[in-house]
């Protein structure tokens, strides 16, 4: 166990996409490519030996757990997995107290929880970097992986159009932060009553955000079309109501045909074929979903390396 400090100066967290600068995001994405190349060559990359990652899950997960756990082991570290069922988090211990204790024993923490304020309270009392594995408000690790995937397949995302079709959830708000930082335009189409919250987004210029009532218009000329489930965790009681409201927001072959001829399709998974996307699209030639899922691991490895070791030259 090392002292709970980083080698790149002041303590840094990744609670929102904008917690890193555009140049730092670019560095992490470059490192993700290098780290992935080493992984594909079976070349060991273990800069985090003797480091420990604590993963705190208050929301269930498949990809987040596997990608962080496998990634930390591959970099030579160890992992502790905590849930509300097997820790004091489920027994009313204040999150601040958990942060004070856990961060004295590990080197970095990933939390997947409900309210953004909860992870912010943890980070405010942590002595080590804290990563947002998902909250109701933001999903920055997923967008980091998505942008890495786009670059891998099509090159720079700057100047491109990303079309978001479906619920204005944590993914869409994180895409908006990325668009503001990295110089691409976000097209958003949602059903009435499920739009982006004006109080949260402010007044971004059309070069950053355009909102559409018609999902076909949102997809017009897009270089990346992406979506998510219609009913996120915590909203299960609204499932039937949402299925009716979102019926016309299923990404299908017609929407992809409206996009740029070289457009790719992404989905953060799990997917419900026949709801937010057709099987023809997610299993078709424009889909890069499976690379996108794998790239969670590589992007997060680069992120953890950066938060703990700083930039490596």
Curated annotation (Swiss-Prot):
Keyword Amino-acid biosynthesis recorded: yes
Group of enzyme by EC: transferase
Catalytic activity: carbamoyl phosphate + L-ornithine = L-citrulline + phosphate + H(+)
Disulfide bonds: none
Binding site for carbamoyl phosphate: 61-64, 88, 112, 139-142, 268-269, 296
Pathway: Amino-acid biosynthesis; L-arginine biosynthesis; L-arginine from L-ornithine and carbamoyl phosphate: step 1/3
Keyword terms, alphabetized: Amino-acid biosynthesis, Arginine biosynthesis, Cytoplasm, Transferase
Protein name: Ornithine carbamoyltransferase
Lineage of producing organism: Bacteria, Pseudomonadati, Pseudomonadota, Betaproteobacteria, Burkholderiales
């Amino acid at each position: 166990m090392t002292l709970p400090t980083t080698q790149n100066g002041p303590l840094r967290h990744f609670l929102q996409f904008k917690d890193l600068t555009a140049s730092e995001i670019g560095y992490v994405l470059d490192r993700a490519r290098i780290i992935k190349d080493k992984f594909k060559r079976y070349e060991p990359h273990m800069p985090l030996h003797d480091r420990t990652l604590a993963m705190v899950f208050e929301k269930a997960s498949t990809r987040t757990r596997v990608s962080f756990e496998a990634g930390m082991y591959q970099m030579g570290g160890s992992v502790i997995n905590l849930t509300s069922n097997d820790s004091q988090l489920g027994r009313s211990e204040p999150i601040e107290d958990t942060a004070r204790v856990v961060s004295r024993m590990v080197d970095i923490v990933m939390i997947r929880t409900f309210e953004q304020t909860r992870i912010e309270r943890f980070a405010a009392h942590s002595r080590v970097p804290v990563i947002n594995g998902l909250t109701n408000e933001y999903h920055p690790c997923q967008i980091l992986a998505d942008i890495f995937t786009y670059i891998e397949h099509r090159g720079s995302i700057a100047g491109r159009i990303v079309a978001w079709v479906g619920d204005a959830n944590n993914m869409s708000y994180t895409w908006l932060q990325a668009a503001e930082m990295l110089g691409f335009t976000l097209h958003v189409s949602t059903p009435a009553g499920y739009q982006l919250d004006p109080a949260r987004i402010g007044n971004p210029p059309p070069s950053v955000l355009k909102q559409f009532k018609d999902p076909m218009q949102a997809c017009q000329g897009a270089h990346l079309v992406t979506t998510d489930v219609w009913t996120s965790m915590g909203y299960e009681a609204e499932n039937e109501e949402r299925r009716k409201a979102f019926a016309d927001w299923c990404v299908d072959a017609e929407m992809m045909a409206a996009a740029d001829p070289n457009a790719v399709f992404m989905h953060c998974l799990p997917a419900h074929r026949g709801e937010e996307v057709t099987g023809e699209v997610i299993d078709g030639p424009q889909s890069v979903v499976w690379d996108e899922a794998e790239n969670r691991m590589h992007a997060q490895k680069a992120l953890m390396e950066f938060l703990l070791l700083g930039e490596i030259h």
